[in-house]
């Protein structure tokens, strides 16, 4: 079955994320385990952990349906050693928070070279950062998100993701989340069924579908290969609806969280209903 949902707010308590997911008829969701604009937050208290777990049980959310997202401040490929250490410490803290909540994924953007080191050096720093985090934590899978290639961000091509994974010691604890807006903005076509087939054949060849742990389903305000990350509601952007229908009907993407981060949260429930209707066609 498809797990479909959206990135919901954790305002008011982590347990509220489950209720917000239910309100839009979601069977998957994403959220920040802490303030995404801060490096560190107070440790989770046991009461909040228990409340979150109880809500997940009450509404039948399993760990594989939930794809928490890390802080945007973290840059696991940072060229400056002091800020690289800070990023690594923050990332490990978020991995621990996920483990405490009984979750198995942490989705993150790989990082940026900031024009201070080469892309290859940055990719190696990301791999080293993940290895350090995996050594210091248990159970949680580090899920690398592809990027649009905006600015000096790495991770905008399958070769980058493959290179990061190649240098991970425990490959059972690394995965990939594909964001369709980022994919399109970085030059991978998705506008027709054939385009989708070609793009994901490349993904399977260079990385492997076994590493795909989640999908961020977003249309794009900007044209293909724009290298600009601007999400749009499904069918209202440059990608169009064919890609989303193809993805939702593809059995390779069953049993992984498919998360909306589209432009208008007010129509998330409508978008989820539409996706489910496409599955039935």
Swiss-Prot record:
Q: Where does Zn(2+) 2 bind?
A: 145, 179, 216, 261
- InterPro entries recorded: AP_endonuc_2 (IPR001719), AP_endonuc_F2_Zn_BS (IPR018246), Xyl_isomerase-like_sf (IPR036237), Xyl_isomerase-like_TIM-brl (IPR013022)
Alphabetical list of PROSITE patterns matching this protein: AP_NUCLEASE_F2_1, AP_NUCLEASE_F2_2, AP_NUCLEASE_F2_3, AP_NUCLEASE_F2_4
Which superkingdom does the taxonomy of this entry point to?
Bacteria
Instruction: Report the cofactors.
Output: Zn(2+)
- Gene3D superfamilies in alphabetical order: Divalent-metal-dependent TIM barrel enzymes
Quick one: which residues bind Zn(2+) 3?
Answer: 182, 229, 231
Q: Which GO terms describe its molecular function?
A: deoxyribonuclease IV (phage-T4-induced) activity; DNA binding; DNA-(apurinic or apyrimidinic site) endonuclease activity; phosphoric diester hydrolase activity; zinc ion binding
| BP GO terms, sorted | base-excision repair
Q: How is the cofactor bound?
A: Binds 3 Zn(2+) ions.
E.C. code: 3.1.21.2
Pfam families under this entry?
A: AP_endonuc_2 (PF01261)
**Keywords recorded for this protein, A-Z:** DNA damage, DNA repair, Endonuclease, Hydrolase, Metal-binding, Nuclease, Zinc
Q: Which residues bind Zn(2+) 1?
A: 69, 109, 145
Identify which top EC class this enzyme belongs to: hydrolase
- Catalytic reaction(s) noted: Endonucleolytic cleavage to 5'-phosphooligonucleotide end-products
* UniProt-listed PANTHER family: APURINIC-APYRIMIDINIC ENDONUCLEASE, ENDONUCLEASE IV ENDODEOXYRIBONUCLEASE IV
Its job: Endonuclease IV plays a role in DNA repair. It cleaves phosphodiester bonds at apurinic or apyrimidinic (AP) sites, generating a 3'-hydroxyl group and a 5'-terminal sugar phosphate.
Q: Which NCBIfam families match?
A: nfo, PRK01060.1-4
Protein family membership: Belongs to the AP endonuclease 2 family.
Q: What is the name of the protein in this document? A: Probable endonuclease 4
């Amino acid at each position: 079955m498809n797990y479909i949902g959206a990135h919901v707010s954790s305002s008011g308590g982590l347990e509220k994320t489950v209720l917000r997911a239910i309100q839009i008829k979601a069977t998957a969701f994403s959220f920040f385990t802490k303030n995404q604009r801060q490096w560190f937050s107070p440790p989770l208290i046991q009461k909040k952990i228990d409340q979150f777990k109880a809500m997940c049980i009450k509404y039948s959310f399993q760990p594989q349906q939930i794809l928490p997202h890390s802080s945007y401040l973290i840059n696991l490929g940072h060229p400056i050693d002091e800020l690289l250490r800070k990023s690594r410490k923050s990332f490990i803290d978020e991995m621990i928070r996920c483990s405490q909540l009984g979750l198995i994924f942490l989705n993150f953007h790989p990082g940026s070279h900031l024009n201070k080191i080469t892309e290859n050096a940055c990719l190696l720093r990301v791999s080293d950062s993940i290895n350090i985090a995996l050594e210091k934590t248990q159970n949680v899978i580090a899920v690398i998100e592809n990027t649009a290639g905006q600015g000096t961000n790495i991770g905008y091509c399958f070769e980058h993701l493959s290179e990061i994974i190649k240098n991970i010691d425990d490959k059972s604890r690394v995965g990939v989340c594909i964001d369709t807006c980022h994919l399109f903005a970085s030059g991978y076509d998705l506008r027709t069924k054939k385009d989708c087939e070609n793009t994901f054949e490349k993904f399977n060849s260079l990385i492997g579908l076994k590493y795909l742990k989640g999908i961020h389903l977003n249309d794009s305000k900007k044209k293909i290969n724009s290298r600009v990350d601007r999400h749009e509601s499904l069918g209202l952007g440059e990608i169009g609806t064919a890609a989303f229908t193809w993805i939702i009907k593809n059995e390779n993407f069953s049993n992984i969280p498919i998360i909306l981060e589209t432009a208008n949260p007010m129509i998330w429930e409508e978008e989820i209903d539409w996706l489910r209707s496409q599955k039935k066609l």
